[in-house]
Amino acid sequence: MSYKCSRCKRDVELEEYGGVRCPFCGHRVLLKERAPEIKEVPVE
């Protein structure tokens, strides 16, 4: 799962039991990245 640190804006990959902390700056607030693809929904 890909996250972005809210302080240093770097991409962070978290492991399943690694804890929630940025390995670069130590900040504990991580933002979940959205999927880059756009979904199309048919409208009737």
Swiss-Prot record:
Record text on subunit structure and interactions: Part of the RNA polymerase complex.
Keywords: Cytoplasm, DNA-directed RNA polymerase, Metal-binding, Nucleotidyltransferase, Transcription, Transferase, Zinc
Annotated TM spans: none
Coarse class of the protein's main subcellular location: cytoplasm
Species: Haloquadratum walsbyi (strain DSM 16790 / HBSQ001)
Enzyme class: transferase
Needed cofactors: Zn(2+)
Catalytic activity: RNA(n) + a ribonucleoside 5'-triphosphate = RNA(n+1) + diphosphate
Gene3D superfamilies noted in UniProt: RNA polymerase ii, chain L
Name the UniProt record assigns to this protein: DNA-directed RNA polymerase subunit Rpo12
An MF annotation (GO) of this entry: DNA binding
Known function: DNA-dependent RNA polymerase (RNAP) catalyzes the transcription of DNA into RNA using the four ribonucleoside triphosphates as substrates.
UniProt lineage: Archaea, Methanobacteriati, Methanobacteriota, Stenosarchaea group, Halobacteria
